[in-house]
Amino acid sequence: MLMSRITPFLVVLAVVLWSAHPLGGAMEERLGLEFLFALRGPIDPPGDVAVVAITRNSARALGLSEKLHEWNRQPYADVTRSLKTLGARTIVYDVFFEAERQAESDVAFQNAIAEAGNVLLFARSEQDAIGAAQLEKLEQPLAQLRQAALGTAPLVLPKVPARVSRFFVRHPSFYGIPTLHGLAWLLQQDDKDKAMQALMDLPVSLPLNLYGPPRAIRTLEFSDLIAQPDVFAADINGAT
């Protein structure tokens, strides 16, 4: 009788102590969240967010290489103009536009970014070893594109575990630098000073709230936005 009463207590205590341990807490977050998401099921995603996916289908439809680094910048100029025309609130690129490509296409993309006035570009976070020390720096995109953009910011993802369960709202190594999604949110607030303070008061990373399986958030093909943008007017108007 005593054993039947004490066993559940010991099990609960073991779970609590294991969760309090850093290793246990990390495992609990990965496995526990996965279980809770499965138990909860899919939920409605935000209606003001759209993902533009660059897939093999888009590459083939545009007659371009499936290797993204081989593309010139004209398709990006075209899709930026489509998004702006359709009323996108903010356009956020997580592609790193590092080096010059075809000069004419670089200028076309630069002009499209400047005309849109609401484009954020990805700045890459890099680590260099100097002796025993690690130096981290932010590499900015191509200067002519950066100067045309509304802003740049890093996109930081955890290197482990393989399943992403958290996201960063600020760069973990640089004080006061929001990530791309943090900056996108910040720029949409009326009181930016207050919003920045709220962002700084948050933990540097937060648990990710999964809405459902892949493409649960409205996802559009890159090539479709170029070929037939008007079809997606309702999806893009007012969205980030």
Region spans (language model):
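Extracytoplasmic
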Residues: 220-240
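Active-site Gly/Thr loop motif
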Residues: 202, 206-221
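Non-transmembrane functional regions of envelope-associated proteins
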Residues: 2-207, 236-240
